[in-house]
Every structure is written in C-alpha cells, then in structure tokens.
Amino acid sequence: MIRNRVKRLRDHGIAIEGSIILGTDEQDEDTIKRLVDFLLEIGVDMAEFTILTPFPHSPIRAQLEKEGRILSNHWIDYTADKVVFQPKRMTPEKLQEMYYYAWETFYQGGGYQLRMGELFKKVIRREMDDGTYRRYDTRRKRGFQ
C-alpha cells in the first residue's frame, strides 16, 4: 500500500520526505536496518531520522519515568540526535549507532545527489511548462529604490 502511494505521488512530480523516529519500544537493530532498506526500495526522496526524545510533559516522558528508563535530565542532551533513555530492545549505545547507520546508509554515495538533481529538474520543467519559471539575470541591477 505504501509503495503504491509513494509511486503515485512521485509520478505526479511530488517529492516524498520521510520523518522517522528511531528507538520506539518495537524497534531493534534489525528492524531499523529493514526500515532504511525499505525507504530506499520504495524511492523516498529524502529522510530525516531522529531519536525518540522524551520531552517534558509528554506522555512518553511520563511512561519512561514511571519505568525508570530516563538516563539524562540534562536538557542540553535533548536534541533528537542523542539517546537520553534506555531503549527496550537494544542498548543506548546500539541505538545511537543505528541512528548514524540510518543517516549514512540512506545518504551514502552519490545516490542522494542524483535524486535531488532529478527532483530539481522536475521542478524547473514544471515551472517552465506552467509559465512560472523566471531565469535569474545576473546583469540586472537589484536593490531598493
């Protein structure tokens, strides 16, 4: 189902960005690896990976506090790219490693640059077709009058 939706959107020139939270109780190392593979397989254009972050006054914060799984109360660590709780199915160090793995694997090599180049070409082509494209003239004076 997701594959078909992604394909339909991409066929209409719409880029797909996935926002992925890593570290949920259902995830382990293998789950995260399969998730990254799936995103690449279905042709997601961009992905943003974050680590589950139990911010104050959130339900997940209350749950993790109740379970004694909060590892840090230093708010400078609450950046969505650092593990500040004890994951259920892996060590905090393994989750941190999987976070880096997700970014590096999704954006490895030149594939990302090629995808962004293709996306940019589609945008320009569409703007040219509908008359909204304006070429930037470097010789034209710009400024306030």
Q: Which residues does each PLM region occupy?
A:
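A structural motif corresponding to the C-terminal lobe/cap of the Radical SAM core domain
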Residues: M1-E127
